[in-house]
């Protein structure tokens, strides 16, 4: 990240993939504040990139870092603090990842009706927008749907149904 600034290069030259993994590593180590500062870099770059249309790559990693932020800490409410910036127009896969993040987080908070809304949007994306040329990513969406459904069943104390969903 710093080398881009030192060489006065455009932010689109940043390696957001590595930034995402650094964020995840810090979360795994329990260094929550440091991880938050890394996520803040992505958030800032994403907002600026949308405004100037100069760096739309930063948005690709938004849902990944968002999901890691609450899954690794089990702080399900944190998602409310990280709405995407105005003007974010993700591709189908990133939109699906964002819907998973919202659906899973709300399910874990017991907001079942809201979780089901995100689940329906996720299913609609899978059925409408995905084609065979997305490699195996369609399976990701199916797994995300199952994870949300499992979280709902766990919250409802329907453990038999949750286990059945998890085994699919």
Task: Name each model feature, range by range.
Residues 144, 159-168:
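Generic long, charged, amphipathic alpha-helical segments
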């Amino acid at each position: 990240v710093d080398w881009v600034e030192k060489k006065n290069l455009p932010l689109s030259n940043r390696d957001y993939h590595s930034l995402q993994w650094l964020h995840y590593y810090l979360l795994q180590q329990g260094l929550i504040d440091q991880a938050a500062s890394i996520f803040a870099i992505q958030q800032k770059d994403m907002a600026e990139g949308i405004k100037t249309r100069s760096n739309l790559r930063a948005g690709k990693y938004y849902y990944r870092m968002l999901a890691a932020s609450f899954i690794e800490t089990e702080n399900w409410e944190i998602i409310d603090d990280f709405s995407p910036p105005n003007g974010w127009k993700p591709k189908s896969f990133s939109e699906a990842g964002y819907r998973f993040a919202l659906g899973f987080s709300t399910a874990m908070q017991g907001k079942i009706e809201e979780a089901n809304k995100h689940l329906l949007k996720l299913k609609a994306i899978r059925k409408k927008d995905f084609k065979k040329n997305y490699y195996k990513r369609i399976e990701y969406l199916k797994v995300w749907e199952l994870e949300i459904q499992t979280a709902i069943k766990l919250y409802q104390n329907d453990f038999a149904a949750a286990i059945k969903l998890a085994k699919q």
